[in-house]
Amino acid sequence: MVAFTVDQMRSLMDTVTNVRNMSVIAHVDHGKSTLTDSLVQKAGIISAAKAGEARFMDTRKDEQERGITIKSTAISLYSEMPDEDVKDIAQNTEGNAFLINLIDSPGHVDFSSEVTAALRVTDGALVVVDTVEGVCVQTETVLRQALGERIKPVVCINKVDRALLELQVSKEDLYQSFSRTVESVNVIISTYADEILGDVQVYPSKGTVAFGSGLHGWAFTIRQFAQRYAKKFGVDKVKMMERLWGDSYFNPKTKKWTNKETDADGKQLERAFNMFVLDPIFRLFAAIMNFKKDEIPVLLEKLEINLKGDEKDQEGKALLKTVMKKFLPAADALLEMIVMNLPSPVTAQAYRAEQLYEGPADDANCMAIKRCDPKADLMLYVSKMVPTSDKGRFYAFGRVFAGTVRSGQKVRIQGPNYVPGKKDDLFVKAIQRVVLMMGRFVEPIDDCPAGNIIGLVGIDQFLLKSGTLTTDETAHNMKVMKFSVSPVVQVAVEVKNANDLPKLVEGLKRLSKSDPCVLTYMAETGEHIVAGTGELHLEICLQDLENDHAGVPLKISPPVVAYRETVETESSQTALSKSPNKHNRIYLKAEPIEEEVSLAIESGKINPRDDLKARARVMADEFGWDVTDARKIWCFGPDGNGPNLVVDQTKAVQYLNEIKDSVVAAFQWATKEGPIFGEQMRSVRVNILDVTLHADAIHRGGGQIIPTMRRATYAGFLLAEPKIQEPVFLVEIQCPESAVGGIYSVLNKKRGQVVSEEQRPGTPLFTVKAYLPVNESFGFTGELRQATGGQAFPQMVFDHWATLGSDPLDPTSKAGEIVTAARKRHGMKEVVPGWQEYYDKL
């Protein structure tokens, strides 16, 4: 255990080469928090006895009750490496004390926005995978997010105790299952990795994969075993590491290494990994679990494990846990893997800077981030807000990328919409205190240099969820985070007692601060809407709202799904609309945008802020757009970045540029509330064909053009075979074979369609993947558990928007029923207005 003081930590923060910022990511219930415990215990914060049960990182009451992690929490660990290990580190280091900032993030898919916030401030990730279940859908999602942020992964294969005790596998089977898991992780890595990172695949023989059990507190890497044997046999450690994985065999008779499975007499040889690594572990397990009292002391002596007085009386699992913890302590293996293989901020920021910074790659701040320079101007990214014990106040949680942040320092607080040189979304305020985040506690410090993760007090009123802090007036923002999930499930919230309304409004503000991916807004009907990524996410948000943020009893409507409005074909005739004073006319047509273009816009590949020519080239080369059209995109909508476009196809129109702003504003308005039932439009492209304008500027102001453009857009939209789109989840369900039938029956009832079904090799488990409309997903988990006797566990991720085939304008069709219900709820007329209402005759 380390005697651990804040001053020690503060001095470590200055040697940035010895800092590691890393997050722990994994599928739900693969054991992140449990593994994190053994690390925290090593750094001397939990007492040794409680580790494995403390789940120190789950700071919230509901996390401990549900046994899942909801928010990502940060903690700093201190580790000293032996000199021989420090020699092997590929990057520069000073001395052998290391500071590891670790963020434990949730695995449940509804909270993947928390994961994004955690990834942004770290440089490396520990990916935890369950031996038995292997790589699941969420493992892939978070790993893809990490690689997208240029983060280097290392892998820990967890729950090996399950394979040994529950499934009783043989050594060769265990090796094969390890090797399959490593392979499937590497497939994901090679698919999504950025070339700049170089080869970031994981190799057990290079020590980037650990195997172990978080619950029992043991883990090992091949490097550790290679070190043991290298001393014993006097061989080179690196050679030994390569031999302990893959197809290499040791022939005990001839004392020679070979890569053939059989010896000269055709006898089967044992794989080196099984013989040297798994054998001692298997023998310990067998001796202890079969209560062979006489074998145990012999084995312990061979492996140099000393038990203290009362530990000798233990037996069964308790003894197993004690022995394995002493033989292969999890913290040592993981800390060694983290320190040896993950990059320091100095290394990482060199290749992450361009991706983090919005401005040009050659300006002073970008260069400072590349160097991770503590003496430059401050560049600090706040990735999320953490509620304090004090009701309604938040710590800003983030990372210093350049410069040094001090208590009492005056900084420019730039929100996500800030543009250099303008005054919008900008505050200049002083930071009250700088604190170290330590899981459940915070420790105040004076200042914090570049490359470290930090909490700030006193700026929570000025930032909504994330933003950039800087001392340089010309600095651009750090790039906004891309969330892999979108809020598609909404509820309306009202107070039971009308006097509590102000508290609700205040509570909603705090809620949207504390969760990076929740949307709160007030609908036109005066309802307060809360939107979340799924059922569980919403449930947690509303519980927070009622108990913490607002603190008043609430009435909550049944959940509603967000739809989108779209078109199928080009408008059947040109839509024309005249301005209220009859002096201006706009002619346009609407047509659909290809799905891949919409997806490229939504994922940020085609970006409204990109350079015009570069964007046009991408659209022409990859998506087959006409170059002149691609250059004449006026705007994206809604909110200036949605998947709808206005394209100017006019020829030689006078005064056209003067009305551009009005047209853009009208388009934002029209796409935010479509004509069918006031939902956002998606994949609609409006081509402006011709405009006739009045010669006097006074007769073509915003008041004339905006309503005209909106009416024209609606008319063109309704003339182009309108359809509605519903959100669809990708569901992954793991279950034993006997339960597969139950899954199919529930999915059929819920309009689900099965995409694939496969058995995981070496286990009795099946994985079923299916598409399930979000609309049908409420209560799905409960019904599934009933139908399968609680053996099936679904994971749902928003996957895509699916167009409903039926006609939304026909009130008897499926789509029509949805539209009518929504229009009633919004308080509109029940019948959708025809295109004639928005169309003007010449």
Curated annotation (Swiss-Prot):
SUPFAM superfamilies: EF-G C-terminal domain-like (SSF54980), P-loop containing nucleoside triphosphate hydrolases (SSF52540), Ribosomal protein S5 domain 2-like (SSF54211), Translation proteins (SSF50447). Keywords: Cytoplasm, Elongation factor, GTP-binding, Hydrolase, Nucleotide-binding, Protein biosynthesis. CDD domains: aeEF2_snRNP_like_IV, eEF2_snRNP_like_C, EF2, EF2_snRNP_III, EF2_snRNP_like_II. Residues 17-253 form the tr-type G domain. The modification Diphthamide is found at H699. PROSITE patterns: G_TR_1 (PS00301), G_TR_2 (PS51722). Signal peptide: none annotated. It comes from the Eukaryota. InterPro entries: EFG_II, EFG_III/V, EFG_V-like, EFTu-like_2, G_TR_CS, P-loop_NTPase, Ribosomal_Su5_D2-typ_SF, Ribsml_uS5_D2-typ_fold_subgr. GTP binds at residues 26-33, 158-161, 213-215. It is found in: Cytoplasm. Its EC number is 3.6.5.-. Belongs to the TRAFAC class translation factor GTPase superfamily. Classic translation factor GTPase family. EF-G/EF-2 subfamily. This is Elongation factor 2.
